[in-house]
Amino acid sequence: MSFYVTNGGFSPIFVTAAVSALTLLAVVSWQVSTAVRERGAANSYVAPASGSDALVSDTAVNAALASDAQTEIGTAVIDGIVAKYLSLQEQGLYTPEVAAKTAEKMAETLKVPVPFRTYTAADIAVDADTSYARMLTYRRDLQVSLAPLLRNTQPEYEIFAYYVSTKDKKNLGKLQRAAQNYREAASSTARVTVPKDALAHHLGILNSMEEFAATLDALVANADDPFASAVLLRTYNQGEADVLTSFAVLAKYYREKKS
């Protein structure tokens, strides 16, 4: 997400961002189903048609899906897939095609919460003055405190897409720096004294920036795990939406303040 400065403050630039992010999510979800096929899921844990070996253990199933790049989040995703696959087997519905489609469908709906620092009213200095003049001072203060966001000139989903296609580690470095810029902006903004009637909006932008920074870090940490990446991209979409919403609400506060 990139930002530019206007007289009203910071405005998000996100033309085509939603479509592009969803396209990237589809690509990574496709990687999930491909990974299932490549790891021989059908041969590894399809129950025999007859005999005493009714079903192999969950451990064997996980081993069949595991890879060197597997992460904790990816393992959790696999656990869910395993449970679904075993259910398909028990119902006699399992085929390699159904299995791959199931993995893809699950990747489209699963989400994972990402822990992040949460600011509360107790963390913020509040001014009882809610005048128009005070709002103007507050807006100028925010333009200074949010300046680190101006370093984020390339959409984060685009950077991650380049990594997915090229595996160039420089792109992961860019994502890490973008996350740091969000945290730096949040830290500086937390030290701004806020008009009492803007406190809720202020907390909104602080927490959304921390959430988005944590999501970017999680994407970097799980970049080579297609299972985790597919889930985290949905978390990314939500985090980005939260940032955009928080700034839109703040802009509305500016507009509605009367002199």
What is each residue range found by the language model?
Residues 179-189, 216, 220:
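Extended amphipathic alpha-helical scaffold segments
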Residues 169-176:
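A loop-to-helix transmembrane entry motif
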Residues 26-36, 216, 223:
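Structural signature of transmembrane alpha-helix termini at the membrane-water interface
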Residues 2-32:
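Membrane interfacial helix-start segments of signal peptides and signal-anchor transmembrane helices
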Residues 32-108:
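Juxtamembrane proline-rich low-complexity "stalk" or linker regions positioned immediately after a signal peptide
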Residues 185-203:
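Short, solvent-exposed, charged loop/turn and helix-capping segments
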